[in-house]
């Protein structure tokens, strides 16, 4: 059975649709709970989520890694599925995850698609079918057995950015990782707010700085300097 964990901070515009899509596309009723791990939203995120009858935990520490770990600590099922608040899984996602786990994959993700049509974004998404770490990000969602999640110590809370890169690298050392060839649908809002090509350039710059060993503080300061941030 699956526990879905969604980290949130001021996501009132997206959270209801994401929750509803999860329930709707869980065709075999494998999702037993949705846990909203909120980082202290000042809008109606919690109110919107409460209206959908999901579990809500208010995290003592804000930050995606810390919130996902905190949400996972409340999970009651053997499979954890981490989904961003502005990302919706594909139809039949839960059975796809179950099939992957039963086939010996202890962790994995889906391909990516955006809610805005642009040739560059489509090309970007096409490459997410390949198992290349440079194009593996949290927007693609992440499923993992609770056992393996705990074995790697969860998300590294020192990682303010690229926490998904870190945990996937750790998981690949101890388990088989797969990419399910169906796309999640995620918001293109950062691309539209900052410019598609500029945003992609920023993402790759931050990734390569990460690979070169720059500190999280340097990555975050560079990111915030270059991109318009409404929430973080």
Which residue ranges define each predicted feature?
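Short, well-formed alpha-helical segments that are part of the catalytic scaffolds
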Residues: 11-26
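Conserved donor NDP-sugar-binding/catalytic core segment of glycosyltransferases
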Residues: 91-119
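Hydrophobic helical membrane-anchoring modules
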Residues: 172-232
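Acidic donor-binding loop at a coil-to-helix junction in glycosyltransferase catalytic cores
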Residues: 161-167
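A conserved acidic beta->alpha catalytic loop
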Residues: 38-46, 87
